[in-house]
Amino acid sequence: MRIDRAGWPFLAVPLGSSAALSVLGRVSDRRWARLAAWPFLALTAYLAVFFRDPQRRCDSAPPASEDVLSPADGVVMVAGEPQPGVAPEGDWQQVSVFLSVVDVHVNRSPYRGRITSSSYTPGSFLAAYRAESAHRNERSELWVQDGDRTVVFRQIVGVLARRIVTRVVPGDQVATGERIGLMKFGSRMDVFVPRECTVLVTKGQRVRGGETAIARWSRPT
């Protein structure tokens, strides 16, 4: 199982503690040390699952050129009209995906093109499923442009998530579904597409990052 590199510092402490206690238990024949190693081993296993980075179809085959893909695994919270006061200036549709603590937290670009803008906003740590988290929580906003097509997407942290990792900067070229970063421990992602796109998902639907088409351009490139 592939682990995102941001996860290794978190895995090192419980993994090292588990190993040290196991060795101590064997060398000194202390049963308590062997038993104490198990919770650390369980925590290591959970963190490994949390920071997992599975391959997706877009990693081996380019998606359809008109498709906008989900940037993350999770459940669709918003599909269609933007929440009040949330969308960037302009005429947009919104798709928001809520990530639970058991979902893959690696984030992917929903569409191809050049990163034209990147901004980070510090903020609160409200529950990510609450509407006001979109404009009050800590977040990172990225704009990607391909010709006359523009898609805006945001990484938004929640109650448990306390750090956003964004690995692209303005000027970078990204492919649809390409890895662009991750959010740690529960969060949401908002995607904004123009009115000319058709939203393909519905509220409550489960989606997979880099695989599920959440919107489609109405005209081919």
Where are these regions (language model features)?
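Short amphipathic, positively biased membrane-proximal segments
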Residues: M1-T221
